[in-house]
Amino acid sequence: MDSQGPIILEKSIKIEEVIKIANTSIIDIVTKTVTPEIKAPYELVDVEYDKMGSDYILSILVDKEDGITVEDTSDLTNIISPLLDTIDPDPFPNQYMLEVSSPGLERPLKTADSLKAAVGSYINVSLYQAIDKVKVFQGDLLAFDGETLTIDYLDKTRHKIVNIPYQAVAKVRMAVKL
């Protein structure tokens, strides 16, 4: 503060943006810490850090080929929890609850490899910007070559094919076909 009062910044940042940036770095730190310790047959699917009500939840989603059991999540929690306590400096601004679980039926597809493995599956794709006035596509993933997703989706009553550039994709997850 100078003698004329507080300095007002010309560009304001929304608190949601600050929280998102902080959560991203927490997710990156946790991912780098736990990835080397989650060994076959397990696969780290995703790390999420969110506020639910007044609580913060650190969710570590893990899977294996024949599915995760309650015993698996207990064993993994016993491996992961002490690892998180060793991170220095502590990246968590608040107390949090650790949740180790299966990604479920609508698991996120975060990597090119997971997308390649999902060819033939029914998926949900959210885009950064709309293609033909559509920002979310849900349909069968026909192909993925590392650069383009090809999806067969239903537009009202007609099947259509769309090619989506991989860099245009904000989120992809498995979807349940009803």
Curated annotation (Swiss-Prot):
GO biological process, one term: ribosomal small subunit assembly
UniProt keyword Magnesium, yes or no: no
InterPro entries the record matches: Ribosome_maturation_RimP (IPR003728), RimP_C (IPR028998), RimP_C_sf (IPR036847), RimP_N (IPR028989), RimP_N_sf (IPR035956)
Annotated localization: Cytoplasm
GO cellular component: cytosol
Keyword terms of this UniProt record: Cytoplasm, Ribosome biogenesis
UniProt key word Flavoprotein: no
Domain of life: Bacteria
Coiled coil location: none
Family classification: Belongs to the RimP family.
Reported function: Required for maturation of 30S ribosomal subunits.
Protein name: Ribosome maturation factor RimP
